[in-house]
C-alpha cells in the first residue's frame, strides 16, 4: 500500500514538473521572425493577393478577384481585411456613387513584394 502511494506521489511530481517546463517553454529566438511572417502573410491566398497587387497597384476588388484565380468572395474579403489590419495593404474608400474602394501595397507590403520577386527568381532557376 505504501509503495503505491510513493509511486503516485512520484508520478504527480513528474507531471507537475513537466507542466511547469511546458509553461516556461517559449519559441526559439530564431523562429520568431518566421512565426511573425506566417501570422501576417501565411495561408493559401495572402501571398497571391500581395503578388497581384505588386503586379498592378492600386486595384479594385473585382480586379483582384480576377487576378487571383479560384478565390472565393469570402476568402478575398477576409484576406484583404487581415492584410489591411496587419499593415501590408492600404485601403482607400472614395465617397462616390457607386462607392469605390481601391487596395494598394503599403510600404511594408511593398518590401514584402520585393522578397516575392526573389522567390520568383529562385523558382525560375530551380525549374531549369
Where do the PLM segments sit?
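Basic amphipathic alpha-helical segments that dock to polyanions
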Residues: 76, 80-83
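Short, solvent-exposed amphipathic helices
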Residues: 111-127
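A short, conserved structural fragment
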Residues: 84-92
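A cross-family signal for key residues in well-ordered alpha-helices
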Residues: 35, 51, 78, 114, ...
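N-terminal helix-turn-helix DNA-binding core of bacterial DNA-binding proteins
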Residues: 28-75, 96, 102
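Basic, amphipathic "hinge/linker" alpha-helix immediately C-terminal to the N-terminal HTH DNA-binding motif
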Residues: 95-116
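N-terminal leader segment of winged-helix/HTH proteins
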Residues: 1-41
Amino acid at each position: 500500500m505504501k509503495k503505491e502511494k510513493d509511486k503516485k506521489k512520484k508520478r504527480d511530481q513528474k507531471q507537475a514538473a513537466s507542466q511547469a517546463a511546458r509553461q516556461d517553454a517559449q519559441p526559439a529566438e530564431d523562429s520568431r521572425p518566421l512565426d511573425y511572417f506566417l501570422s501576417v502573410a501565411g495561408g493559401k491566398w495572402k501571398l497571391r493577393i500581395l503578388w497581384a497587387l505588386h503586379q498592378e497597384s492600386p486595384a479594385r476588388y473585382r480586379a483582384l478577384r480576377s487576378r487571383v484565380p479560384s478565390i472565393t468572395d469570402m476568402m478575398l474579403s477576409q484576406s484583404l481585411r487581415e492584410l489591411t489590419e496587419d499593415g501590408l495593404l492600404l485601403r482607400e474608400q472614395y465617397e462616390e456613387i457607386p462607392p469605390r474602394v481601391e487596395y494598394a501595397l503599403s510600404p511594408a507590403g511593398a518590401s514584402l513584394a520585393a522578397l516575392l520577386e526573389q522567390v520568383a527568381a529562385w523558382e525560375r532557376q530551380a525549374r531549369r
